[in-house]
Amino acid sequence: MESKQLKWVLLSILSLIWGSSFILIKKGLIGLSPIQLGSLRILFAGFFLILVGFKSLSKISFQQWKFITLTAFFGTFIPAYLFAIAQTEIDSSVSSILNSLTPLNTLVLGSLAFGLHFRRNQIIGVIIGLIGSALLILNGAMNHPEQNYYYALLVIIASICYATNVNLVKKHLSGMAPLSITT
C-alpha cells in the first residue's frame, strides 16, 4: 500500500476509534458514575502507554517534564472527567459535535496565548468546520430541546483543554518523539 493510501486508511481507523468513544462513554455511564468512568479511561490509557512507551521515558529531559505534565493534565485528565459528566445530561452526538470546536479553539488560543502563526488555508478550514459545527448544533438543539445544554459548556471546556494541549506540544515539545510525549 502506498504511503498516501496508508495515511487515509489510518485516518479512517482513527476516526472510527475516536468517534465511537462518545457512544462508549454514554454506554459506560449506565453502570458507572462519571468519576469512575473518567478514572477508568485514564487508567487504561496510562497502562497501555506505559507498556508501549516505557523505554522512551528516559529520553525526556527534566525541563520537558513540566510541559509533559501540563499536556497530560489538559490533554487527558481534565477532558476525561468533563466528557463523562457532560454526557449524563446531553447526547453523545451533541458531545462529539461540540468536540469538533477543538480546531477553532486551537487556532484562537495558538494565536492569542502562544504567539503561533497559522496559514490562510488552515484558517479557512477552521471557518468551514465552524459553520458545519454550528449547523449541526442548531439542528440538535431543535430536535432535542429536553436536554440540559448547560452541560454542553463542559464539552466546550474540554475542547479548550485539548486546544491548550495541542498548542503546548507545538510550542514546547515539537522536537520530541510523539511516543515520549504521550507516555
Model-derived features: positions:
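Cytoplasmic-side transmembrane-helix entry/capping segments in multi-pass membrane proteins
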Residues: L11-S12, Q63-F73, F118-I131, Y151-A152, ...
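Specific alpha-helical transmembrane segments that line the substrate/conduction pathway
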Residues: Q36-F47, F83-H117, Q122-I123, A158
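Specific transmembrane alpha-helical segments of multi-pass solute transporters/efflux pumps
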Residues: L16-F22, I50-N99, L135
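Transmembrane alpha-helices of multi-pass small-molecule transport proteins
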Residues: G31-I78, N105-L109, C161-N165, T182-T183
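Juxtamembrane C-cap of transmembrane helices in multi-pass membrane transport proteins
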Residues: S21-L32, F44, A80-I90, L98, ...
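Glycine-/small-residue-enriched transmembrane alpha-helix faces in small-molecule transporters
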Residues: M1-Q36, H144-K171
